[in-house]
Swiss-Prot record:
Any Pfam family matching the protein: RNase_P-MRP_p29
Keyword Phosphoprotein: no
Catalytic activity, as annotated: Endonucleolytic cleavage of RNA, removing 5'-extranucleotides from tRNA precursor
Any Gene Ontology biological process: tRNA 5'-leader removal
Name used for this protein in its record: Ribonuclease P protein component 1
Protein source organism: Pyrococcus furiosus (strain ATCC 43587 / DSM 3638 / JCM 8422 / Vc1)
Length: 127
């Protein structure tokens, strides 16, 4: 009955554990992504997947300095792939610096990014 018990112990609910492992070290796949429409005014409403990101400040010192490309986004977290590791970073405790395709750097608080990407479009923001 429990033939595959070893495999079951190592599994997580939802996604498989190794779902991001094949991306490690292959960050070149995001370099060709055309993200020319992202600027400081519309980054809150824009898709973040594929953008280069760096954690500038955080309440947790372990998150400061994480750098890589955003490969997934959930309501409260960004999944960032670096050169040799994948990090899951909470949005609400960090300040991020995104780099656009032309090299401009946009610094934004993670509290403004909390929420699913499709729901952020519906929010109204003060300018």
């Amino acid at each position: 009955m429990w033939r595959n018990s070893e495999e079951r112990e190592n599994r997580t609910s939802g996604r498989s554990q190794g779902s991001y492992q094949e991306i490690i070290g292959r960050t070149w796949i995001f370099r060709g992504a055309h993200r020319g429409r992202v600027n400081k005014k519309n980054i809150v409403w824009h898709e973040l997947i594929g953008l280069k990101v760096r954690v500038v400040n955080s309440t947790h010192p372990g998150y400061v300095g994480i750098e890589g490309y955003v490969i997934d986004e959930t309501r409260n977290m960004l999944v960032i792939a670096g050169e040799n590791k994948v990090w899951k970073v909470p949005k609400d405790v960090c300040i991020f610096e995104f780099e656009t395709w032309d090299g401009t750097k946009i610094k934004i608080s993670g509290e403004k990014l909390v929420g699913r990407p499709e729901m952020r479009l519906k929010k109204r923001w003060r300018k």
